[in-house]
Amino acid sequence: DIERRSADYSEGTTASYDYFTQLRERTRTLDGIAAWTKVSLTLADRGQGNAVYGNMVSGNYFSLLGVRPALGRFFAPDEDRTPLTHPVVVVSHGFWQSALGSDSGAIGRAVTVNGNPYTLIGVAPAGFRGVFSPLRVDAWVPLMMQQQLRSTRDLEDAAWLRTFGRLAPGSSVGQARQELTALTVAYIADRGERGGNRDYNTIRLSALTGLPADAREGFLGFMQLLLGA
């Protein structure tokens, strides 16, 4: 059964970038898999800085959730391919109102994120706060910028990501768990790793508590015990 305790989805990071991309390419029970991780940001517009809670996300994060921007756009496919090439940022509707004065002209504006030049490309819809409800996210940046914003992490191997997916039509939670477990075991075998005493036979699935109750159906946050070197 799907786990409903939000704590299950918030405890630690669970996937390396390499593991995430392999799951995304090989899954058949899920329509898509996206990844995110938390990051502390200082976002400054015209010299006025604001400390915000942010997320770094895969390029399909918003599209998989079916979220549409209130203004501007979300991340394009080419902004999710090459590290450090697309310094762009999306802000929450609340941040746009409180820090940017509800200025529709803010789209395309040069801002700074942790002192680095970025372009503001979009505003999330009112009420959208990310996929983990206890925390309100005010800014989203591409995973590909992680070396600039989290320089101690290696994009390929470190276990620094949380992942979620959307069930494909006709697929059940049980089928998704079985497939994800098999893909995880195969991933470990391909890398020549051994699990020691860790149990790889259970994939914990949880509801995405940050989404409205009527929008959660079909979405699964998942945790596994591997991950990374």
Protein language model regions, located:
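Membrane-proximal extracellular/periplasmic loop immediately following the first transmembrane helix
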Residues: 1-40, 159-164, 206
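Conserved, non-catalytic sequence blocks in retroelement Pol enzymes and Pol-derived host proteins
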Residues: 79-81
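N-terminal membrane-entry
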Residues: 214-229
